């Protein structure tokens, strides 16, 4: 699947979940298009990549589609996670309740700062990095979340790779490239913010150009 399609799947899942909670039982691609601001043809094309899910002229069963996309996203089972880095971002992620509702269960949080050892963040106690490997093995950790400086991210990722971890959600300011067996999602929060400022700048430039055109037409 293309990266664009993979990026749309969580949006489909989120919107369908809201429709299900609102008691909507069936929806057409046109109706979903109006809600999500994605063309109806794109929606049908996306769903056809996974078998279609609906019938022409009949639409989609919301609950069924929600469950099937959840399976594609791997949300039909729970995932055990750890956070490495107990700073502001790590603590914010640990405190975010919605992860648990999606089946993402935080089992531990680690840091190399002795001042944080033993600190409780929700029901997690900050542990030293020396205990990382043992904890990962004993608790069958699937995913590690890195909220640490980029200087130490690669070393920590390689330590995790040796423990047969399945995936890394990386917030460190470095793109990690590990073996094919380990899935890595590199997240740069500033990238999203820069996309926003690009769109603001493009909109403002468009207004400036249209104002200049109107001015020239008036003189």
Q: Which residues make up each language-model segment?
A:
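Hydrophobic/small residue at the entry helix of a nucleotide-binding pocket
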Residues: 89
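NAD(P)-binding Rossmann-fold cofactor-contacting core
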Residues: 100-122
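HTH-adjacent hinge/linker in prokaryotic transcriptional regulators
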Residues: 26, 30, 35-78
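Phosphate-bearing ligand-interacting subdomains
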Residues: 17-20, 124-208
């Amino acid at each position: 699947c293309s990266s664009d399609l993979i990026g749309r799947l969580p949006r489909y899942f989120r919107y369908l979940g809201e429709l299900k909670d609102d008691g909507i039982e069936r929806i057409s691609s046109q109706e979903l298009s109006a809600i999500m601001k994605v063309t109806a043809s794109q929606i049908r094309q996306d769903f056809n990549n996974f078998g279609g899910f609906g019938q022409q002229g009949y639409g989609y069963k919301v609950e069924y589609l929600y469950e099937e996309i959840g399976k594609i996203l791997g949300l039909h089972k729970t995932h055990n996670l750890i956070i490495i880095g107990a700073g502001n971002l790590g603590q914010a992620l640990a405190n975010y309740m919605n992860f648990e509702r999606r089946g993402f269960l935080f089992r531990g949080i680690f840091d190399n700062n002795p001042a944080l050892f033993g600190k409780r963040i929700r029901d997690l106690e900050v542990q030293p990095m020396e205990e990382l490997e043992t904890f990962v093995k004993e608790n069958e950790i699937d995913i590690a979340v890195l909220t640490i400086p980029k200087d130490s991210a690669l070393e920590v990722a390689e330590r995790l790779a040796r423990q047969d971890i399945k995936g890394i959600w990386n917030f460190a300011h470095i793109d990690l490239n590990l073996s094919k067996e380990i899935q890595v999602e590199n997240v740069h929060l500033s990238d999203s913010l820069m996309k926003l400022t690009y769109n603001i700048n493009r909109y403002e430039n468009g207004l400036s150009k249209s104002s200049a055109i109107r001015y020239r037409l008036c003189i």
